[in-house]
């Protein structure tokens, strides 16, 4: 069985037969429109976000499987607080504020893909991502929020 794996980032629910998908899948001998349709059905819940997708093609049988990953934490943060873009100057300009409840929700979604061994540390990773997006956490800078997590201020969210 000759298996080819194509990994791409697509906009949730809006994959097309054009680049980057079409040129990567076309030569493998499967119906591109079927692949696009399956990807769009599987990613429609992530509309407006970049979603990692893995297309596994069996070139002998001309069949395919689609595996959808979880969008990057930055995309989940922006969707959760309802903004399209983060701050242009993340350390100087705040693009929005996120609650610890929302942080924990994102951490639970991403936990399997993270190196953190518990929800508290996974949440700290998500808070760390807030630095690069320019988002405050409960009105604090992300570094202040991480110190507050370490101090136990938000422990009620992790039980």
Curated annotation (Swiss-Prot):
It comes from the Archaea. GO terms for cellular component: large ribosomal subunit. Pfam families: Ribosomal_L11, Ribosomal_L11_N. GO terms for biological process: translation. SUPFAM superfamilies: Ribosomal L11/L12e N-terminal domain (SSF54747), Ribosomal protein L11, C-terminal domain (SSF46906). GO terms for molecular function: large ribosomal subunit rRNA binding; structural constituent of ribosome. Forms part of the ribosomal stalk which helps the ribosome interact with GTP-bound translation factors. Belongs to the universal ribosomal protein uL11 family. This is Large ribosomal subunit protein uL11. It comes from Methanococcus maripaludis (strain DSM 14266 / JCM 13030 / NBRC 101832 / S2 / LL). The lineage of its organism: Archaea, Methanobacteriati, Methanobacteriota, Methanomada group, Methanococci.
């Amino acid at each position: 069985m000759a298996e080819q794996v194509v990994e791409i980032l697509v906009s949730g629910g809006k994959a097309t037969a054009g680049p980057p998908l079409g040129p990567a899948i076309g030569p493998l001998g499967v119906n591109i429109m079927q692949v696009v349709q399956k990807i769009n059905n599987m990613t429609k819940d992530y509309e407006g976000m970049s979603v990692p997708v893995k297309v596994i093609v069996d070139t002998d049988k001309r069949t395919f499987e689609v595996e959808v990953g979880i969008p990057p934490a930055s995309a989940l943060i922006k969707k959760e607080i309802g903004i399209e873009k983060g701050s242009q100057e993340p350390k100087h300009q705040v693009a929005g504020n996120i609650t610890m409840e929302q942080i924990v929700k994102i951490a639970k979604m991403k936990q399997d893909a993270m190196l953190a061994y518990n929800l508290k540390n996974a949440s700290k990773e998500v808070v760390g991502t807030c630095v690069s997006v320019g988002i405050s956490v409960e009105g604090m800078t992300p570094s202040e929020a991480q110190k507050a997590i370490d101090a136990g201020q938000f422990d009620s969210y992790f039980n």
